[in-house]
């Protein structure tokens, strides 16, 4: 045997030994050799690899640290979004979650009377670590990529850094792992590791961290992986993303498989059945919280069976099959030193408490939110008071109550300034209006608002920061500090001014040179052709988030239609209630906002919207005359009465013109309902408004003659469809809306009268029942083909 062959054999032996010791130490918590012996074996391997560099491989335990610092983190697009979890703060929240799960699985669970308690769901339970969510991608058992969660859709490539975490296997153990396996989990720092890190920083005069979570996040995002390697980071897996191959069919089974492959999981993982067992687990972990080696802020419950998870699906930003049950926030006493007022993007002037610094759950708190002046009044708060401070969710400090017995004699009342603390404009008090069922009522609350609009630098800065953000116009490199410079120097007085910035103006900014100037101007130029959805979100319409912006763009197709849509028309969009509809309508009706939009769309310097088109077919098909009458909120006219009126008269004009005798001939329409309807349409303003709404609905492609004719004219009229399993191209709710737009009735269970079942991956008893009854079954491709045939947009 040659020297090289002998070295190769010894290197392979050392790597196997070290990997085994790492697995026993970090995963099984059963160290088999002293640390000194581990270090000796590690140094021997390093020496051999230095002497025989041709035998060095990337998965060697010595290769956790990269040699050259990175200049920046690359972007990683998550194939399957890394969604956040919904939260439970009270026991009732947990019970409501369990009820929703059981309702969603009604036809899959045994036990008869479901909500009577006959069936209980199995849940996996584990502590919610207070760290940073990351994704580890393994291909053929080798770690090939690490990424942060980011915004859920896009994260940062931190491969070099996660390789330095000692309990992250560079190569999976055992066998049976999928060819491609994305492991998701939390990078965190133990309490002991955090204390040691800070102690070392104090000794060397370095920076200390406020808490383990900040330390973990800061360590993981170092461009130099050598720094990350010097920090005591750990990883704990809690789930999976993309997979090419097979995994066990339960959450607990998958995590136990991870453990067998060398991937660390929580030692507190448990499998329980029912909501009470979840509560018992929560109480047990809560009692032992301070004794755990790491910080946690709650526990996580997940439906155990993967098929059930698929059946339940997702909401817009969170799964329906999992919830984080947060612990009560930590509270401390401190003194209110003063109150300052800050101005937000919409001009709202809100109070911020300035506190005598106090440690709350490991963080020094000197400021706290007071939300608004109604909250100040509710608390009876005065400057000089001793107050109870809570970090809600262990993150956001709040003033919870006043300790009245400690109030000093010179405590001062808190008053809203008459003029904006930033621009000096008047501060106006606006009474809040509550809208419900077409009626307005004055709310007890009020909002104080600076009237300066974009002439107020605080509002201008926040408006531009929102406008350029990743989910809006996505102008890379235009951070908060640069926005502040642009506004402070008078270079930008509205978002439209970004598109007229010159090279000379940007070059003069602090921190800019030739390359950075060109990069920023290029990024601004690249943002000139946004999608309609991005542009709507970028405008900063109150209560319009990213999902609502997408819905508006997808349904109405153009900025012109959105801008002139009446609030009653907007409520035909799913999940757009009266409050949001009026916010949208009022925003576009405002002359100042119209001017800003006109400047942004200036033909020479402004943006050119992409993806403008027609009204979506499913939106045009979603209106009915009965539904329209119901939305008018006429007293004593409920949905049943509206259907009878639509069937009897067939048109809005016919209903408006109906006299008392005509109305009394409507079968089983109560006399008081008939009188209420006649009184309503005797008011000219009501007639004018109803006709205006109908005219706009017709302009947007909606038509009706009678409820029966509207349905009979649709291709799937009279058919009952059922959706089951997971759909990839769209959510089941969207598919349901599209089918209903074609005239189908979408039911929750299969019967002999069912026309067709659409079955995606994970379909269970509904698919089996369809096959048993001989009901037609389509897969997702078949459903999409059907939509294409009938001109329904995907």
Curated annotation (Swiss-Prot):
The keyword Transport does not apply. It holds the Pfam family DNA_ligase_ZBD. GO terms for molecular function: DNA ligase (NAD+) activity; metal ion binding. It is an enzyme of class 6 (ligase). Zn(2+) binds at residues 420, 423, 450, 456. Belongs to the NAD-dependent DNA ligase family. LigA subfamily. This is DNA ligase. It comes from Pseudomonas aeruginosa (strain UCBPP-PA14). The lineage of its organism: Bacteria, Pseudomonadati, Pseudomonadota, Gammaproteobacteria, Pseudomonadales. The gene is ligA.
């Amino acid at each position: 045997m040659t020297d090289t062959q002998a070295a190769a054999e010894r290197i392979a032996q050392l790597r196997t030994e070290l990997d085994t010791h790492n697995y026993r130490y970090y995963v099984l918590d059963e160290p088999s050799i002293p640390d000194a012996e581990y270090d000796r074996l590690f140094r021997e391997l390093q020496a051999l690899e230095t002497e025989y560099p041709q035998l060095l491989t990337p998965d060697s335990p010595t290769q956790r640290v990269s040699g050259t610092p990175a200049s920046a983190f690359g972007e990683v697009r998550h194939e399957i979004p890394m969604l956040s979890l919904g939260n439970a703060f009270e026991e009732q929240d947990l019970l409501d979650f369990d009820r929703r799960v059981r309702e969603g699985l009604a036809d899959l669970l045994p036990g008869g009377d479901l909500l009577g308690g006959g069936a209980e769901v199995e849940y996996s339970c584990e502590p919610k670590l207070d760290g940073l969510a990351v994704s580890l991608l393994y291909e053929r058992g080798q770690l090939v990529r690490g990424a942060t969660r980011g915004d859920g859709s896009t994260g940062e490539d931190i491969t070099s850094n996660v390789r330095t975490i000692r309990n992250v296997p560079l190569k999976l153990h055992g066998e049976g792992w999928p060819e491609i396996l994305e492991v998701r989990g939390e990078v965190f720092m133990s309490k002991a590791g955090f204390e040691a890190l800070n102690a070392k920083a104090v000794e060397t005069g370095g920076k200390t961290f406020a808490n383990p979570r900040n330390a973990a996040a800061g360590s993981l995002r170092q461009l130099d992986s050598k720094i990350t390697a010097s920090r005591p980071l750990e990883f704990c897996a809690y789930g999976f993303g993309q997979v090419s191959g097979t995994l066990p069919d339960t959450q607990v089974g998958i995590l136990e498989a991870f453990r067998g492959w060398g991937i660390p999981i929580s030692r507190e993982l448990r499998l329980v059945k029912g909501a009470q067992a979840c509560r018992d687990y929560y109480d047990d972990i809560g009692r032992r919280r301070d004794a755990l080696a790491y910080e946690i802020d709650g526990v996580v419950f997940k439906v155990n069976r993967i098929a059930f998870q698929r059946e339940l699906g997702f909401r817009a930003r969170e799964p329906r099959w999992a919830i984080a049950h947060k612990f009560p926030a930590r509270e401390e006493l401190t003194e209110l030193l003063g109150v300052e007022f800050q101005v937000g993007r919409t001009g709202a002037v809100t109070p911020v408490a300035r506190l005598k610094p106090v440690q709350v759950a490991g963080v020094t708190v000197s400021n706290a939110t007071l939300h608004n002046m109604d909250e100040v009044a509710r608390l009876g708060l005065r400057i000089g008071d001793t107050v109870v401070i809570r970090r809600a969710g262990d993150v956001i400090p709040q003033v919870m109550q006043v300790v009245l017995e400690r109030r000093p004699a010179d405590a001062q009342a808190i008053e809203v300034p008459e003029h904006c603390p930033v621009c000096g404009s008047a501060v106006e008090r606006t009474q809040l209006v509550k809208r419900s069922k077409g009626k307005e009522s004055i709310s007890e609350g009020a909002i104080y608002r600076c009237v300066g609009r974009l002439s107020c630098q605080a509002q201008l800065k926040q408006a531009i920061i929102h406008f350029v953000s990743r989910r809006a116009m996505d102008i890379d490199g235009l951070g908060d500090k640069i926005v502040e410079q642009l506004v402070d120097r008078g270079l930008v007085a509205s978002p439209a001014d970004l598109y007229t910035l010159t090279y000379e103006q940007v070059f003069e900014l602090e921190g800019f040179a030739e390359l950075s100037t060109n990069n920023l101007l290029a990024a601004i130029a690249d943002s000139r052709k946004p999608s309609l959805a991005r542009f709507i979100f970028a405008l900063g319409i109150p209560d319009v988030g990213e999902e609502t912006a997408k819905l508006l763009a997808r349904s109405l197709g153009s900025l012109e239609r959105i801008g002139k849509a009446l609030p009653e028309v907007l409520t035909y969009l799913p999940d757009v209630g009266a409050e949001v509809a009026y916010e949208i309508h009022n925003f576009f009706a405002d002359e100042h906002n119209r001017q800003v939009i006109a400047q942004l769309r200036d033909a020479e310097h402004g943006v050119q919207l992409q993806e403008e088109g027609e009204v979506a077919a499913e939106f045009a098909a979603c209106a009915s005359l009965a539904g329209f009458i119901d939305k008018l909120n006429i007293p004593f006219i409920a949905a049943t009465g509206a259907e009878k009126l639509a069937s009897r008269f067939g048109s809005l004009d016919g209903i408006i013109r109906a006299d008392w005798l005509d109305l009394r001939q409507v079968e089983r329409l109560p006399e008081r309902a008939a009188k209420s309807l006649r009184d309503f349409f005797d008011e000219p303003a009501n007639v004018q408004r109803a006709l205006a709404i109908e005219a706009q609905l017709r302009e947007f492609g909606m038509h009706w003659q009678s409820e029966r004719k509207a349905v009979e004219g649709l291709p799937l009229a009279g058919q009952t469809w059922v959706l089951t399993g997971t759909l990839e191209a769209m959510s089941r709710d969207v598919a349901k809306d599209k089918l209903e737009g074609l005239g189908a009735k979408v039911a929750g269970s299969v019967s002999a009268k069912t026309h067709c079942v659409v079955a995606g991956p994970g379909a269970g008893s509904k698919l089996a029942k369809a096959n048993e009854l001989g009901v037609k079954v389509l897969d997702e491709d078949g459903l999409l083909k059907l939509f294409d045939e009938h001109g329904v947009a995907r």
